């Protein structure tokens, strides 16, 4: 999707106050909802993703699972509000050996586990709004050896940015 796009600075893939914030995202909703609301704390439009289980209500990008984002920027930045419920996000990267690796961070896990194709890790959210900066290059290097990145899937949101 962004493979032939000049990538420098920030590349926004989700912006809740845009006219179509989920245009390139697929939505899965079962026993929950995905809707745009005005947040009382910041008095701005936000995307609320809420469900009874993190595996039944979520968004994924790109919408077509056969496509890839083709983004080479090393950082994933998200602004997330702590709703005091289970939260997780997942991102998949393609390393320099052409191996897809997934990283999953969640606020309900207590230990880090590194397996050949997935690394799961705990994440703590402060009360209110949190800025999550995920250094994909560093996490990939520390978990799987030195790698260069291009990532195809995954993510969760007021604003989601990728930056170099």
From Swiss-Prot:
Domain of life the protein comes from: Eukaryota
Biological processes annotated in GO: cilium assembly; flagellated sperm motility; positive regulation of cell motility; positive regulation of feeding behavior; protein polyglutamylation; regulation of cilium beat frequency involved in ciliary motility
InterPro entries membership: CFA20/CFAP20DC, CFA20_dom
Pfam families for this protein: CFA20_dom
Compartments, as annotated in UniProt: Nucleus; Cytoplasm, Cytoskeleton, Microtubule organizing center, Centrosome, Centriole; Cytoplasm, Cytoskeleton, Cilium basal body; Cytoplasm, Cytoskeleton, Cilium axoneme
GO cellular component assignments: axonemal B tubule inner sheath; axonemal microtubule; centriole; ciliary basal body; cilium; motile cilium; nucleus; sperm flagellum
Family of the protein in this entry: Belongs to the CFAP20 family.
Function: Cilium- and flagellum-specific protein that plays a role in axonemal structure organization and motility. Microtubule inner protein (MIP) part of the dynein-decorated doublet microtubules (DMTs) in cilia axoneme, which is required for motile cilia beating. Involved in the regulation of the size and morphology of cilia. Required for axonemal microtubules polyglutamylation.
Name of the molecule in the record: Cilia- and flagella-associated protein 20
Organism: Rattus norvegicus
């Amino acid at each position: 999707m962004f493979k032939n796009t000049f990538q420098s600075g920030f590349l926004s893939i989700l912006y809740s106050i845009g006219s179509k914030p989920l245009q390139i995202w697929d939505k899965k909703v079962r026993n929950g909802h995905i809707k745009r609301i005005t947040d009382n704390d910041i008095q701005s439009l936000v995307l609320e993703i809420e469900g009874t289980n993190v595996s039944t209500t979520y968004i994924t990008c790109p919408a077509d699972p056969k496509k890839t984002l083709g983004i080479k920027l090393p950082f994933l930045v998200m602004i997330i509000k702590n709703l005091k419920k289970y939260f997780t996000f997942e991102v998949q990267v393609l390393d320099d050996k052409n191996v897809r690796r997934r990283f999953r961070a969640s606020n309900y896990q207590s230990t880090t586990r590194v397996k050949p194709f997935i690394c799961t890790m705990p994440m703590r959210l402060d009360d209110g709004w949190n800025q999550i900066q995920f250094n994909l290059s560093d996490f990939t290097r520390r978990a799987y050896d030195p790698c260069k990145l291009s990532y195809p899937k995954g993510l969760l949101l007021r604003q989601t940015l990728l930056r170099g």
